[in-house]
């Protein structure tokens, strides 16, 4: 059983992440870190406003980071150093140095660090890749 702590309660977590955790029999929602603790009421779990306390008290094994981009690296690193596996929303970090620090924290902790690039498997994205490979739509010069 994997016990998840979700950091950030926005569209992606309420529409996709938390429902997926609740639907998976091998996963359990251990708690939520949010600025608005009442958001946890809908899920019947405890809420924290302080990540450090949540990591210590929730009993989680893994953390899903879905906060503003500027918080991805520091929250992921803190979670990894606390011995938790981390799945972080994209972008992983604001720059290369932050990404390297995250990877280093994962290596030092022996925990897994993943980035939630779920759209890469969308049929439309795969079709765009095919069209690019075939030369049908030219060479990409920028992607977002």
Annotate each language-model stretch with its function.
Residues 31, 62, 142:
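Short, Asp-centered acidic motifs that coordinate Mg2+ and/or phosphate
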Residues 93-144:
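A contiguous active-site-proximal alpha/beta segment in oxidoreductase catalytic domains
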Residues 27, 61, 84, 111-112, ...:
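Short, well-ordered coil/turn segments that N-cap beta-strands
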Residues 20-24, 43, 78-82, 101-109, ...:
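Alpha-helical structural signal in soluble globular domains
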Residues 6-8, 64, 144:
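Short beta-strand segments
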Residues 45-105:
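Beta-loop-alpha module in the N-terminal Rossmann-like domain of NAD(P)-dependent dehydrogenases
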Residues 1-43:
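N-terminal Rossmann-like dinucleotide-binding module
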Residues 24, 57-58, 122:
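Acidic-histidine catalytic/liganding microenvironments
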């Amino acid at each position: 059983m994997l016990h998840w702590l979700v950091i950030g309660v926005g569209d992606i977590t309420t529409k996709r992440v938390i429902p997926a955790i609740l639907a998976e029999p091998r996963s359990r929602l251990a708690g939520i870190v949010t600025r608005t603790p009442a958001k946890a009421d809908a899920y019947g779990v405890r809420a924290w406003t302080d990540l450090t306390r949540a990591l210590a008290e929730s009993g989680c094994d893994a953390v899903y980071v879905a906060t503003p981009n500027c918080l991805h690296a520091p929250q992921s690193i803190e979670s990894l150093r606390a011995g938790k596996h981390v799945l972080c929303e994209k972008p992983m970090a604001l720059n290369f140095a932050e990404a390297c620090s995250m990877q280093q924290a994962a290596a030092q902790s022996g925990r897994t660090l993943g980035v939630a690039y779920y759209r890469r498997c969308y049929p439309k994205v795969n079709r765009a890749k095919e069209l690019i490979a075939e030369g049908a739509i030219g060479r990409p010069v920028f992607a977002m």
